[in-house]
């Protein structure tokens, strides 16, 4: 896999659309969106997921389900240690189905099945 941060892309910035999650604001935001905010760093240091009451997890870019991903592992990882910890955290949550940012939804069992593949992941510095 390729990764290691150091983005070289021009940022797209819409500050008027920001939702800033802090210890003070998190509970209110979770109430408004009716989901629990789960920190899932690794893909990026500020990656999050949303766990809904109907046992659905929106995991953002913490997992994928489609080309070019293999085994539901995202193709860009900034911090492999954090990424592995986030997968472990996801497997310990109470949900039935995962909705990734890229690809079709899949089951918690599939996430658990491919967790062992993370041990073989190596990052290569770009540039």
Regions found by a protein language model. Give the residues of each.
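Active-site HxH/HxHxD metal-binding segment of metal-dependent hydrolases
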Residues: 1-27, 118-123
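Metallo-beta-lactamase
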Residues: 11, 34-110, 117, 121-122
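Short coil/loop residues immediately preceding or within conserved phosphate-binding loops
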Residues: 23, 32-35
